[in-house]
């Protein structure tokens, strides 16, 4: 199995700790005036999502996590599982709702997602950075009602609620940033 030395640590690196796959969130190299240098690392458990702090001596080696990051197409959700398909092999996988988490509000059928697989099971599902979704419900914007920056909530076809400018109407197609949940612009269609 591949090993990573502490001097190879960087954000996003996948490692094994205590038999579980983790991803490095933050890495800080510390060289005290006295004593051995070390790495203070924040890691997220890919199975549970829990973030913990760990300290590694400088030069220590850690096993690489045998995880596969792949693009898959979201097919449908049956409430308990989100069904994904590999577009090349047409092989289907069922990701539990816990693996999808908050990404569920951005997933539309046929959308391509990044799926992290461990032991051939989906651990996490990340939506694309930008999605195009239709507005299904929003208050009508009243002309001249712009004091205070002007914005209103809009419910999208997946159930997500985003803040949009007053001129947005029901039925419009919007581009939304899934990382921040912010309105980016209209999609000309």
From Swiss-Prot:
CC per GO annotation: cytoplasm
Modified residues annotated as N6-(3,6-diaminohexanoyl)-5-hydroxylysine in this record: 34
Principal location: cytoplasm
GO MF, one example: translation elongation factor activity
Keyword presence, Kinase: no
The protein's annotated pathway: Protein biosynthesis; polypeptide chain elongation
InterPro entries cross-referenced by the UniProt entry: Elong-fact-P_C, NA-bd_OB-fold, Rib_uL2_dom2, Transl_elong_fac_P/YeiP, Transl_elong_KOW-like, Transl_elong_P/YeiP_cen, Transl_elong_P/YeiP_CS, Transl_elongation_fac_P
Keywords tagged on the record: Cytoplasm, Elongation factor, Hydroxylation, Protein biosynthesis
Entries under SUPFAM superfamilies matching the protein: Nucleic acid-binding proteins, Translation proteins SH3-like domain
Highest taxon, organism lineage: Bacteria
Compartment annotation: Cytoplasm
SMART domains referenced in this protein's UniProt entry, alphabetically: EFP, Elong-fact-P_C
PROSITE patterns per the UniProt record, alphabetical: EFP
One GO term (biological process): peptide biosynthetic process
Post-translational events: May be beta-lysylated on the epsilon-amino group of Lys-34 by the combined action of EpmA and EpmB, and then hydroxylated on the C5 position of the same residue by EpmC (if this protein is present). Lysylation is critical for the stimulatory effect of EF-P on peptide-bond formation. The lysylation moiety may extend toward the peptidyltransferase center and stabilize the terminal 3-CCA end of the tRNA. Hydroxylation of the C5 position on Lys-34 may allow additional potential stabilizing hydrogen-bond interactions with the P-tRNA.
Membership in a protein family: Belongs to the elongation factor P family.
Its biological purpose: Involved in peptide bond synthesis. Alleviates ribosome stalling that occurs when 3 or more consecutive Pro residues or the sequence PPG is present in a protein, possibly by augmenting the peptidyl transferase activity of the ribosome. Modification of Lys-34 is required for alleviation.
Name of the protein in question: Elongation factor P
Taxonomic lineage of the native organism: Bacteria, Pseudomonadati, Pseudomonadota, Gammaproteobacteria, Chromatiales
């Amino acid at each position: 199995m591949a090993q990573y030395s502490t001097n190879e640590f960087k954000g996003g690196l996948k490692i094994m700790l205590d038999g579980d796959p983790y991803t490095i969130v933050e890495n800080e190299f510390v060289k005290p005036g006295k004593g051995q240098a070390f790495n203070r690392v924040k890691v997220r458990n890919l199975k549970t999502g829990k973030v913990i702090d760990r300290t590694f001596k400088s030069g220590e080696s850690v096993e690489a996590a045998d995880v596969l990051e792949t693009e898959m197409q979201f097919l449908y959700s049956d409430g308990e599982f989100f069904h994904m398909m590999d577009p090349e092999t047409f092989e289907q996988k069922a990701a539990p709702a816990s693996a999808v988490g908050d990404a569920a509000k951005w997933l539309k059928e046929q959308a391509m997602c990044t799926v992290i697989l461990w032991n051939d099971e989906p651990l996490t599902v990340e939506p694309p950075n930008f999605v195009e979704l239709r507005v299904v419900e929003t208050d009508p914007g009243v002309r001249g009602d712009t004091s205070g920056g002007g914005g209103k909530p809009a419910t999208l076809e997946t159930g997500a609620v985003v803040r949009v400018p007053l001129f947005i109407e029901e039925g419009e197609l919007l581009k939304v940033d899934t990382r921040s949940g912010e309105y980016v612009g209209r999609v000309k269609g």
